[in-house]
A protein has these predicted regions:
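Loop-to-transmembrane boundary segments
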Residues: 3, 136-152
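Serine/threonine-rich low-complexity intrinsically disordered regions
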Residues: 16, 54, 143, 173-174
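Membrane-embedded multi-pass helical conduit in multi-pass membrane proteins
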Residues: 145-199
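Non-transmembrane catalytic domains and loops of membrane-associated enzymes and transporters
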Residues: 1-138
Length: 199
């Protein structure tokens, strides 16, 4: 094992409606997604506030980590995901430890939250390109999970934009976009239920 992460909670979860939603999002990400990934031997992102790394493994990867580049430019965002991918590429397993809990302060207003999500999305897409090389060595479930996460968020964005444009341009209800979003939600919930039963 090269890295492990625990459950992440929002220390300010009772401050606003947004902090409560983020705390719920963290619970799902840790106890559904990361727990399922760990079952197959590879948590794809050991989140910074609650991650621990094997020192010997970290020392081996330090140069790669400190000099990360993307499209010819120095890159310093998404360091937790990048380091996790480097651990997996070096042949280490990554784990989720449910009993280890760390609290972090989360954004309590929309603007900083959206800025954070944009930064994380860039990191996710950048490191997915690195992870694609790992997928043949990993369990088939992890391949499906990585691909579905990326295609799903892209499809959601397209559906939301097309629905908004339909409302603005035609003043009609965007039933097709609603159907796509509802279907994606049902698939996600079904997968969560199946994962929970398997764990």
């Amino acid at each position: 094992v090269g890295a492990a992460m625990g459950q992440l909670i929002a220390s300010n979860r009772s401050d606003t409606w947004l902090t409560r939603l983020i705390d719920m999002e963290y619970w799902l990400a840790c106890n559904e997604e990361r727990a399922a990934q760990a079952r197959f031997g590879a948590v794809m992102c050991c989140c910074g506030p609650c991650a621990i790394y094997r020192r010997t493994a970290l020392l081996l990867l330090l140069d790669q980590y400190e000099t990360q580049m993307f499209r010819g430019k120095r890159s310093d965002f998404g360091e937790d995901r990048h380091l996790t991918i480097l651990m997996l590429a070096a042949g280490y397993r990554t784990e989720y430890v449910r009993d280890a809990v760390a609290a972090t302060v989360v954004p309590d207003t929309l603007r900083p939250y959206l800025r954070q999500q944009l930064r994380w999305a860039r990191s996710t897409y950048r490191d997915t390109l690195l992870a694609l090389r790992l997928l043949p060595r990993l369990d088939r479930y992890l391949t499906l999970d990585v691909i579905a996460q990326n295609i799903g968020s892209l499809l959601l964005a397209i559906s939301m934009i097309s629905g908004f444009l339909q409302i603005v341009l035609t003043a009609t209800a965007p039933w097709q976009a609603c159907f796509v979003i509802a279907s994606m939600t049902m698939v996600r919930c079904s997968v969560a239920a199946i994962r929970a039963r398997e764990l």
